[in-house]
């Protein structure tokens, strides 16, 4: 699992098995006390055969985050996610 700290947020990779497919996510939490985690599915057109593959894809997505906006949305260095 890859994790990165930004000025007001922390982001990390996440994955989930749904049926026979795994999905990749970027999880984001504000550093404000009591903030909730939000999950953003990445590579939404792709399904992965295993959770490990989904984590690898999510790790890549986390590494490409430029910043996180005020609504806890990640801004990536590429536009297809």
For the regions a protein language model found, what residue spans apply to each?
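Short N-terminal "domain-start" leader segments
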Residues: 1-25
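Short, highly charged C-terminal tails/helix-capping segments
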Residues: 71-81
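Acidic helix/loop or adjacent segment enriched in Glu/Asp that either coordinates divalent metal
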Residues: 49-63
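Short aromatic-glycine-(Arg/Gly/Cys) micro-motifs in beta-strand/loop hairpins
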Residues: 17-42
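Short arginine-rich
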Residues: 60-72
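A short, exposed loop/beta-hairpin motif centered on an aromatic-Gly-Thr core
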Residues: 38-53
